[in-house]
């Protein structure tokens, strides 16, 4: 809660700094810059006695003219001393701001202070009232609800660029606290957009969502706007979401409502627009995060696929058996079995029926260790069953 201070001059409303300063200069002087005539001395010819040559503040070039202009302890060409906006030559007075010169008309149009209430210009000699960064005329420094002029020592609140006295601010606070969050934040249809919270004298039939919850709480008054009133409010909202006091008074006169109802409708409409913008921003951020996550996953999968190179197919090598590597003589019918001691351990001879695999040979794959099925079957067919061969050898032994 701020307390209004006394009126002050406009010159004391704005701080002065090295980068943001405004100064009216009345003393534009024209000085005679005489040219040296007559025979030059030896010092001038050698450069030791060369006179100091002025430099123009505007174009930063040396001034070789006979006459020059002096402004604020700086030198200017006559053609460079002109307004930065209208390019009009400055002869008697000028305004200096941010190292630029302006005429009086352009300076007031660009940098003159404006009243935050009526948006009109404030004269430099006029007393003003200031609230934070806002400057008001003495007559415009009043409450936007009761239109009571605020004076020195009055407590007020600056809310969304609008001035409220202490009593109206407390009434609005109590009124807004009685509204449920769902009603104030939810986005309604066009018919429900016209429902605003009026003053005490404008009570209409309407039921709130929380009227039955607390019997001690009074029923919340509502105002149902017509289609024409709603269109007028929306058209004004498209032009400016924060209309000034004159615009609100005009809308109230056109629609037949109070200024307070108009102000509350604009407050609710601004809250709805902020919520819609916030929801849209959240949806965009969620979509962007999902899209980014999908791109990251696809990039990871591509990296995993490229990091593993396919293995070369194993070269299958089949060990073929040579028919001449083993003999079939021991398996012939009617042969005498071995009679020497120890021969019964090798009844079929010392020749191995399988090739001896060289120890230096490297096996490139697991398939090198196995024989082809067709080769094994053919070998078994040629060799025969060893048990049958034993029976035949036994019968031939006892028969002899």
From Swiss-Prot:
Spell out the coiled coil positions from the record.
none
InterPro entries referenced in this protein's UniProt entry, alphabetically = HD (IPR001356), Homeobox_CS (IPR017970), Homeodomain-like_sf (IPR009057), LIM_Homeobox_TF (IPR050453), Znf_LIM (IPR001781)
Q: Which Pfam families match?
A: Homeodomain, LIM
Main location, first listed in the record: nucleus
Q: Which SMART domains match?
A: HOX, LIM
Q: Which GO BP terms sit in this record? A: mesonephric tubule development; neuron differentiation; regulation of transcription by RNA polymerase II
DNA-binding region range list:
218-277
Gene Ontology MF annotations: DNA-binding transcription factor activity, RNA polymerase II-specific; metal ion binding; RNA polymerase II transcription regulatory region sequence-specific DNA binding
Q: Where does the record place the LIM zinc-binding domain?
A: 56-106, 115-168
Q: What compartments host this protein?
A: Nucleus
The UniProt annotation puts the region (Disordered) at: 176-226
Gene Ontology cellular-component terms for this entry are:
nucleus
Task: Give the UniProt keywords, A-Z.
Answer: Activator, Developmental protein, DNA-binding, Homeobox, LIM domain, Metal-binding, Nucleus, Repeat, Transcription, Transcription regulation, Zinc
Outline what the protein does. Answer: Specifies dorsal cell fate during limb development.
Q: What is this protein called?
A: LIM/homeobox protein LMX-1.2
Upper taxonomic lineage: Eukaryota, Metazoa, Chordata, Craniata, Vertebrata
Q: What gene does this protein come from?
A: LMX1B
